[in-house]
Amino acid sequence: MTENTAIIKIIDEITACRNITFEQLHMLLETDDMQAVDYLRKRASEKAHETYGNQVFIRGLIEFTNYCKNDCLYCGIRHSNTHADRYRLSTEQIMACCESGYELGFRTFVLQGGEDPYYTDERICEIVSGIKAKYPDCAVTLSIGEKSKESYQSYFDAGADRYLLRHETADEKHYSRLHPAEMSLANRKQCLWDLKEIGYQVGCGFMVGSPGQTVETLYKDLQFIKELEPHMVGIGPFISQKDTPFANEKSGTMDETLRLLSIIRLIHPKVLLPATTALGTIHPLGREKGIQSGANVVMPNLSPVNVRDKYKLYDNKICTGDEAAECRFCMENRMKSIGYQVVVSCGDYADF
């Protein structure tokens, strides 16, 4: 049996049993047989089509604060980065973003920010309930970090539907390489279990190519995803940011990110899987290639243009100067060019 035949057989096995062994993962990530890699992407794309057809769900991203109390080593808005130009959006500004987004057809708003103590539970609940009152046909997703179960419950009661919290790595040692000592993988995981128990549609995820990542740590990530059964998984390449301790670390690659997107689609066929902005940052057609590898969500930016460039988790981020309407229609045309249709809907998880 040639290597090509062996790998194709492995891809078919993973597709059939929705699981992957360490040896299979190792083989799929290490192979330089691009014919086999194309087959992996093709199978993942077919699997996404089975559930979602040629539809791509579009979410409006609102980055409402770049203050953060944490000091994660990879992140440009880390607490100790004195070069970050800090900002906060008022409730009125956030509502204005939603208003323009709603007019453009967005039916999911993703409120993302650093862990900023200024936004108390009361403030977050007020923002969420305000959006839900004005746009009852829209979903609200929060991505604001680690909170207590009580806090998560209060946001849910205010109307939040989904919560994104990347676990970043399921390996303890790797987690401590990426985060300060006061943060723990155990707490991060507990937050995800709490969110799921409350009733959110939950998203976890990780950076591809972060310092210290290995096939072993990636295998733990896939096992954790299998265990958690999240509704969404957000992965994108690690891209260094010049004002962080990882400034000189090399970035993750598009190739490895696409392979992992495809693998995640095969082991978790109905998952909502974004083709991220970071993927579009490392390659001009990164997001298109992500969709062709099994992803089915894109998240154009609805934040005011004057703050876009300040939300610098990593360097060279794309689309920071474009108006929301430009981003929306640019994305629609990009998806159309590869045979996909951007859908105006909440875009829930298939079985939710």
Across the structure, where does each feature detected by a protein language model lie?
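Generic structural signal for well-ordered alpha-helices
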Residues: G60, C98, C125-S129, Y152, ...
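Catalytic cores of alpha/beta
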Residues: S148-Y155, P211-I225, T281-Q292
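Core AdoMet radical
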Residues: H79-I94, G101-E122, V128, K132-L192, ...
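Short, charged low-complexity linear segments at domain edges
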Residues: A36-F57, A295
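Short, small-residue-enriched loops and turns at beta-alpha junctions
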Residues: T65-N66, E115-T120, A181, G209-T214, ...
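Conserved, mostly hydrophobic/aromatic
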Residues: C17, A44, C72, L111, ...
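Auxiliary Fe-S-binding modules of radical SAM enzymes
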Residues: M1-Q35, Y102, K226-F352
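Canonical Radical SAM [4Fe-4S] cluster-binding loop centered on the CxxxCxxC motif
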Residues: Y52-Q93
